[in-house]
Amino acid sequence: MPTESRSILARAEETRCRHLSRLLRAGLVFLLCDVLTSCLATPELQNTVIRSSKAHHLQLLFSSRSTPAVKFPLDATLSAPNSFGEQEARSVEAVKQNPWATTTAFADFMKRFNIPQVHGSGIFVDLGRDTEGYREVGGKCPVFGKAIQMHQPAEYSNNFLDDAPTSNDASKKPLPGGFNNPQVYTSGQKFSPIDDSLLQERLGTAGPKTAIGRCALYAYSTIAVNPSTNYTSTYKYPFVYDAVSRKCYVLSVSAQLLKGEKYCSVNGTPSGLTWACFEPVKEKSSARALVYGSAFVAEGNPDAWQSACPNDAVKDALFGKWEDGQCVPFDTKTSVQSDQATNKEECWKRVFANPLVASDAPTTYPEAAQKNWNDFWPVHEQSSPKSGGFGANWANFYLEKESGETICAIFDQVPDCFAPITGAVAYTALGSSTEVNLPQCDSASFIPIEGPCNNCVQVVTECVGNQFDQTSKACCTEPEIIPPVKPPVEPPVEPPVEPPVEPPVEPPVEPPVEPPVEPPVEPPVVEPPTEPSVPEPEPPVVLPPTPGEGGGGGTSGDETVEKEGSGGNTALIAGSVLGMLIILALVGTCVGFYYRKRPLPPTERPTVEASGGREVEGPSDVAVPPDHSWWGEGEHETESLLGSRAVDAEF
């Protein structure tokens, strides 16, 4: 290999090594940053598994013994203190722009609406836990306004807060009573219901600060003991708090839904069945009165539900997703169910009872439940679905500008922001119909966030009067658009293209034009010229003198002069006529001579029959003067036909 080529290859190899070294250093720095970021994670972020959610976003799956699996969005990752003790900004770009994830007050308010995370169980029917082979109510948030509608005959009380039936009522079909635990303390005090004032007195100042927290703790602390075996059960029963009577109920029946003619009756039909049908409902009468919850609401901190759960509706706001610098509200296009709603209350009830809401309702029940009522409560071993809190649990109530109708749009996506809309309301299947305002922002420190310019309209999120406000402004201008500078692209070198050699163009060969065939022209019959007759001059007529010519007088002399003049004119006229006749004779002679010399066309050559029985010798025979041709040929022909005697005799 030449020395110059080896030198070029060596330089190229050296350049490649330098590039690889730079890439290696960059990779080490990236890996180091990743390790440091992992080391900064809080203890709550340990033992996590990354999965893909329904909305195709990465989410962290938290697991523990005390709570079912819940999903935590990656874009709401908790911040950790850096080496300087300051709160670090989130690493996800979308989180940097979303104030509902970056600002502490707004982020804490937004987290409570992540129902799979904060509740983790069914809402319409909550049977998300299993204990000792029994299905157990396990949600971590109270459900406001939830009641159980009984379908007993008209003579029954139809109140699910009545005492549950005992063995004394087993003969009645359907069974009377409700779901309340009828146990009694040895002191004679009823186990349920119990006044909140008594709970507050017994628990003291160290107890929960909220009535719901105290009721939940009462149910959580209950231990069922079988008196015959002294077996202690760890099964936890649900509770209901009545805010009007301020009473706490502990239910002995965990079932919340029973339907179908195979299992239950409605108003006694069909007859003979043990159970009357029942189902969960939210009614306006119970909206502010009843709160249904599991005993696990009190696990850990009995008052945590107050700040951790979506207990109320949000006024003048809609749930949405943060996209491109703005909160895009959920509407009919992103909903799973969207219909007109006449009022807000209707939308609040609809989001709780829609068929896609989070529910742990069984689909089948044991057949033995119709024969022995003790086998029914509360085991449903035939089917035991667990929703984990996932479902269509959110609804937006708003006025649709296009149709002028109020719409209730229900959706199953976890929202991550609120879009401020005057007159709108954001509901959840867990919360009450009570409306609360969005948290306040700081107008002095909040930096407006501008969304993208779409169709010449840009959405700007601002803090006006300590409240979030989204306004639209025109964003299209007419500036000079400077295209991005691109490196010049050299056109590929193409070999010169030689022009194609065209073959010589030959003129088109025209077919020979045949002359038109003219019909034979018969020669005109030439008549022999006739000699013009020359008039002989007449002698002048000499008139005798009239009488008196011999006498004198001027008169006779004048008459003589006139006569002489008239004789001269006559001679001139006669000479002119004679000259014309001579000229005509010459012309006729020339014409006759011309036709004598012209050959006859072969097609017109006279035959023997046409020439009187002889062959014509030449064209001159026609032009021979009649005095020669007629007499000579006539004589010859006469001799050949009749003989000379006949001619002589004829003439």
Swiss-Prot record:
InterPro entries: Apmem_Ag1
Disulfide feature: C141-C309, C215-C248, C264-C277, C327-C417, C347-C408, C441-C463, C453-C475
Prodomain residues: 42-81
Main subcellular localisation: membrane
Location of the region described as Disordered in the Swiss-Prot/TrEMBL record: 483-567, 598-651
Region forming the signal peptide: 1-41
GO cellular component, one term: plasma membrane
Keyword annotations: Cell membrane, Disulfide bond, Glycoprotein, Membrane, Repeat, Secreted, Signal, Transmembrane, Transmembrane helix
RNA-binding as UniProt keyword: no
Residues carrying sugar: N230
SMART domains per UniProt: AMA-1
Keyword Ligase in annotation: no
Induction: Readily detected in oocysts (at protein level). Specifically up-regulated in sporozoites, but not in tachyzoites and bradyzoites.
Topological region Extracellular: 42-570
Biased composition (Pro residues): 483-547
Sequence similarity: Belongs to the apicomplexan parasites AMA1 family.
Protein name according to UniProt: Apical membrane antigen 1-like protein
Provenance organism: Toxoplasma gondii (strain ATCC 50861 / VEG)
Phylogenetic lineage: Eukaryota, Sar, Alveolata, Apicomplexa, Conoidasida
